[in-house]
Every structure is written in structure tokens, then in C-alpha cells.
Amino acid sequence: MRWLLSILVRVVLVLCLCFAPLGIPVVARAAELPPVKHLDTPIDVNNTILRNYRQLPGFYPTLARILVKNAPYKSLEDMLQISGLTEQQKALIKANAENFVFGEYQEGANQLENRINQGYYG
């Protein structure tokens, strides 16, 4: 009976050691934000194309698409009011606030479909 308990303890220990590392990085990554990158030329959130958000870690493609589709904005607070943003996405926008400018929206100059897909293939 003692040997059976010893084997059972070893099996449980091996399973814990095998599966424990799988869960820890996932939890740690979910709580962390990508590093903030300072841009020399800020992004004009009202007139930029989707691909410009590739410069900012964590934005491209999902958050970038949300921001492009919901433009124009008057301020950072307007960006944070987008329906459906997660707390992590809001934190990412706030952390990168210095990389955004709110230029006057040029309606007709950049149609939404062209701001999302400029046809760069290859």
C-alpha cells in the first residue's frame, strides 16, 4: 500500500511540473501591456490608414481597425468612449496618448475602405 501511495505522489508531482509552466506565462502575458514606443511623428488618428498603427505594439490589426472605423475624434476621451473596448485596449490607448494627434477630419479625402485596405499586396 505504501508503494502505491509513493507512485501516486510521484505521478501527481510529475503532472504538476509538466502542466504548471503552461498556465503561468499565459496569466502573466494577459496582464501585461506591450511596451510603449515613442514615435517621432505622431499618428493623426482622424486621417491615418490602418497600416500606420503597425508602429505601435499591440494595436495592429484589431485595435487599429476599431480606431480607424470609429474616427473622427476630438480628444483622447473620445477614443476611450468607443463601445466594446476592453480595459486592456483602453489602457493601451492611454499609454500611447503622446503618439496621437487629433487633426481635422478630412471627409472624402480618405474613404474608410481606403484607410483600412490601401491595396498593398505582394
From Swiss-Prot:
Protein's GO biological process: photosynthesis; photosystem II stabilization
GO cellular component: extrinsic component of membrane; photosystem II oxygen evolving complex; plasma membrane-derived thylakoid membrane
Sorted UniProt keywords: Electron transport, Membrane, Photosynthesis, Photosystem II, Signal, Thylakoid, Transport
SUPFAM superfamilies reported for this sequence: PsbU/PolX domain-like
Pfam short name (any one): PsbU
Alphabetized InterPro entries for the sequence: PSII_PsbU
Signal peptide segment: 1-30
Location(s) in or outside the cell: Cellular thylakoid membrane
Main location: membrane
Topology with respect to the bilayer: Peripheral membrane protein
Gene3D superfamilies: Photosystem II 12 kDa extrinsic protein
Complex formation: PSII is composed of 1 copy each of membrane proteins PsbA, PsbB, PsbC, PsbD, PsbE, PsbF, PsbH, PsbI, PsbJ, PsbK, PsbL, PsbM, PsbT, PsbX, PsbY, PsbZ, Psb30/Ycf12, peripheral proteins PsbO, CyanoQ (PsbQ), PsbU, PsbV and a large number of cofactors. It forms dimeric complexes.
Similarity field: Belongs to the PsbU family.
Function: One of the extrinsic, lumenal subunits of photosystem II (PSII). PSII is a light-driven water plastoquinone oxidoreductase, using light energy to abstract electrons from H(2)O, generating a proton gradient subsequently used for ATP formation. The extrinsic proteins stabilize the structure of photosystem II oxygen-evolving complex (OEC), the ion environment of oxygen evolution and protect the OEC against heat-induced inactivation.
Protein's name according to its UniProt entry: Photosystem II extrinsic protein U
Organism: Synechococcus sp. (strain JA-2-3B'a(2-13)) (Cyanobacteria bacterium Yellowstone B-Prime)
